[in-house]
Amino acid sequence: MTELAQMKCEACQADAPKVTDAELAELIRMIPDWGVEVRDGIMQLERVYKFKNFKLAMEFTNKLADLAEEEFHHPGILTEWGKVTVTWWSHSIKGLHRNDFIMAAKTDQLLD
């Protein structure tokens, strides 16, 4: 279990700080399978998970939904045949918060 995956998300308000460039560089190394995307000027974490069929992709999606509810932090999820695209960002600050990296690490653990 990674250090990030052991952490809990904290409440993120609109005035919470986004991760700094230095924090981003440190945190992204802890989740090497994730990439950083910028959409509409908003930095986001994204990963595509591959599965053998739609049913397995859907099972993963449902596990992720349960995790998101437990942590009160919710991703963008696109479930397709054989793959699930997961995108994490903090809506309230329109960017990346430490919570997003925690949730990315926790998402990876759903495969175990």
Curated annotation (Swiss-Prot):
Pfam hit, one: Pterin_4a
UniProt KW keywords: Lyase
Keyword Repeat carried by entry: no
Domain of life: Bacteria
Native source species: Shewanella loihica (strain ATCC BAA-1088 / PV-4)
EC number: 4.2.1.96
Enzyme class: lyase
InterPro entries documented for this protein: PCD_sf (IPR036428), Pterin-4-alpha-carb_dehyd (IPR050376), Pterin_deHydtase (IPR001533)
Family the entry assigns: Belongs to the pterin-4-alpha-carbinolamine dehydratase family.
GO molecular function annotation: 4-alpha-hydroxytetrahydrobiopterin dehydratase activity
Catalytic function, reaction form: (4aS,6R)-4a-hydroxy-L-erythro-5,6,7,8-tetrahydrobiopterin = (6R)-L-erythro-6,7-dihydrobiopterin + H2O
Name the record gives this protein: Putative pterin-4-alpha-carbinolamine dehydratase
CDD domains on file: PCD_DCoH_subfamily_a (cd00913)
Lineage: Bacteria, Pseudomonadati, Pseudomonadota, Gammaproteobacteria, Alteromonadales
Keyword Hydrolase in record: no
One GO BP: tetrahydrobiopterin biosynthetic process
SUPFAM superfamilies cross-referenced by the UniProt entry: PCD-like (SSF55248)
Gene3D superfamilies noted in UniProt: Transcriptional coactivator/pterin dehydratase
